[in-house]
Amino acid sequence: MSLAGYGKIIRPMNAGVSGVTAGIAYFIAGGTQPLFSVLLFFIVLVICGAGNVLNDYFDLEIDKVNRPDRPIPSGKVSPKGAVVWAGILFAAGVAAACFTNIWCLAIALVNVVLLIIYAAKFKGIPFLGNLSVAYLSGSIFLFGGFLVGPESFLVMLPLFAITFFGTLARELLKDAEDIEGDRLGGARTLPMQIGVRKTSVLAVIFVLFAVLCSFVPFLTWGVVYLVLIGVVDAFILLVTLRALKFETSTELTASNCTTYLKYGMFAALFVFLLMEILAVFL
C-alpha cells in the first residue's frame, strides 16, 4: 500500500477535468464569482474521484485481466482501504455542496447515490451503465448552471444534451474495445450482446444527436459559434464514422477512435468557453 496509490486511484486527471468543466459551466451560465468556481471544482473533483475509487473496487477481477497495473490489483491500495477512501471523498464533496444552494446540493446527493449504485449494480447491466455515465457527465453542466440560479438551467440544457449523447457514444465504443477483458471478468455489456459493428452504428446515431443539439447555442452565440462548432462536429462525425469499418474489438482499439472522440469533446468545450469569453468582452 502507498499514498501514491491513493492519489492515483481517484484518476486525478479525469476527476480534475470534470472539476474544471464544472467551473467553466458556471462561467458559461453567467457566474462571476471566482470562489464559486473553485468550490465547484473541489466538489466535482472529490465526488468524481470517489466514484472512480468505487469503480476500481468493484472491477477488481476485471482489472486483474484488463488493467493489472491499477492500484488495487497491483497491491498499492487494499480493497478495504479503497472503500474507506471513497467514503471520505463522498462525505467531503457533499459537505462542500452544503455551501452552494439547494439545487446543487440535490444534484450532488443524487450523483453520489447514482455513482454508488452504478459501481455496484448498473455497470453490469448492458446499456444502463452507459446511460448512467452519460447522465453523470452531462450533469456537470447542470451543476454549474444551477449555482448561478434555476433560470440558468435552461441555458445549460443544450450543453447537457451535447455532453450526454457524446459521452454515451464514447462509452459504447469503449465497451466495444474491452469485450475480451469484460468477458473474462464476467461483465455484461451491450457490445458483447450485439457485436462491435452494431455498437458502432449506435454510437454514430448518438453522435448525430449530439451534433444536432450543438446547433441550438447558435441562437445565442451566432455565426462565429456555428463555424467553430461546425469544424468540431465534422471531426467528431468523421472519427465516429470510421469506427463502422471495424468488426473486432482489437481493430477498434488500434484505431484510437475513442481517444480522438475525447479530443473532439474537449474541443467542443473549448468552443463553448471561447464564445462566452467573447460575449463578455466584446
Swiss-Prot record:
Its main location: membrane. Pathway: Membrane lipid metabolism; glycerophospholipid metabolism. GO terms for cellular component: plasma membrane. The chain crosses the membrane at residues 27-47, 76-96, 97-117, 127-149, 154-173, 201-221, 223-243, 261-281. It is a multi-pass membrane protein. It catalyses: sn-3-O-(geranylgeranyl)glycerol 1-phosphate + (2E,6E,10E)-geranylgeranyl diphosphate = 2,3-bis-O-(geranylgeranyl)-sn-glycerol 1-phosphate + diphosphate. Pfam families: UbiA (PF01040). It is an enzyme of class 2 (transferase). GO terms for molecular function: geranylgeranylglycerol-phosphate geranylgeranyltransferase activity; magnesium ion binding. It is found in: Cell membrane. Its EC number is 2.5.1.42. Disulfide bonds: none annotated. It comes from the Archaea. The keyword Hydrolase does not apply. GO terms for biological process: glycerophospholipid biosynthetic process. Keywords: Cell membrane, Lipid biosynthesis, Lipid metabolism, Magnesium, Membrane, Phospholipid biosynthesis, Phospholipid metabolism, Transferase, Transmembrane, Transmembrane helix. Its cofactor is Mg(2+). Belongs to the UbiA prenyltransferase family. DGGGP synthase subfamily. Prenyltransferase that catalyzes the transfer of the geranylgeranyl moiety of geranylgeranyl diphosphate (GGPP) to the C2 hydroxyl of (S)-3-O-geranylgeranylglyceryl phosphate (GGGP). This reaction is the second ether-bond-formation step in the biosynthesis of archaeal membrane lipids. This is Digeranylgeranylglyceryl phosphate synthase. The lineage of its organism: Archaea, Methanobacteriati, Methanobacteriota, Stenosarchaea group, Methanomicrobia.
